[in-house]
């Protein structure tokens, strides 16, 4: 009997080797993701008038608002500052995730 041919373009790997490699890759990605979830990410708006701090799993950990940011005559301004700080914090998480996990997903899409 002839030896089963390896998958073309896979560097001569057989199915068992590919599965082993995929499992290793999955474990590395899980470790990277866990590392991100333990980090904190901060979004700031208008010279730190509003500061939103998140954990890497996108949980809002704290929201700091300077008293001078609270103007009873202009609640829309405070809303805008909170939205800006929150969006900046979430964007930092997205960027860190892309940077960390992007090396594994590059070429898959």
From Swiss-Prot:
Question: One Pfam family this chain carries?
Answer: YbaB_DNA_bd
Q: Write out the GO cellular component annotations.
A: bacterial nucleoid; cytosol
- Show the GO MF annotations: DNA binding
Which keywords does UniProt give here?
Cytoplasm, DNA-binding
Q: Where in the cell is it found?
A: Cytoplasm, Nucleoid
Q: What does this protein do?
A: Binds to DNA and alters its conformation. May be involved in regulation of gene expression, nucleoid organization and DNA protection.
PANTHER family listed in its UniProt record: NUCLEOID-ASSOCIATED PROTEIN YBAB
Assembly description: Homodimer.
By sequence similarity, the record places it as follows: Belongs to the YbaB/EbfC family.
Q: What is this protein called?
A: Nucleoid-associated protein LBUL_1514
**What species does this protein belong to?**
Lactobacillus delbrueckii subsp. bulgaricus (strain ATCC BAA-365 / Lb-18)
Q: Where is the organism placed in the taxonomic lineage, from the top?
A: Bacteria, Bacillati, Bacillota, Bacilli, Lactobacillales
């Amino acid at each position: 009997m002839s030896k089963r041919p390896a998958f073309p373009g896979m560097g001569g790997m057989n199915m068992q080797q590919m599965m082993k490699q995929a499992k290793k890759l999955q474990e590395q990605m899980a470790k990277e993701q866990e590392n991100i979830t333990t980090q904190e990410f901060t979004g700031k708006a208008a010279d730190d008038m509003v500061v939103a701090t998140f954990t890497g799993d996108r949980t809002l950990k704290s929201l700091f608002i300077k008293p001078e940011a609270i103007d009873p005559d202009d609640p829309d301004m405070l809303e805008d500052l909170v939205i800006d700080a929150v969006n900046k914090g979430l964007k930092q998480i997205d960027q860190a995730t892309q940077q960390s996990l992007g090396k594994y997903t590059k070429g898959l899409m």
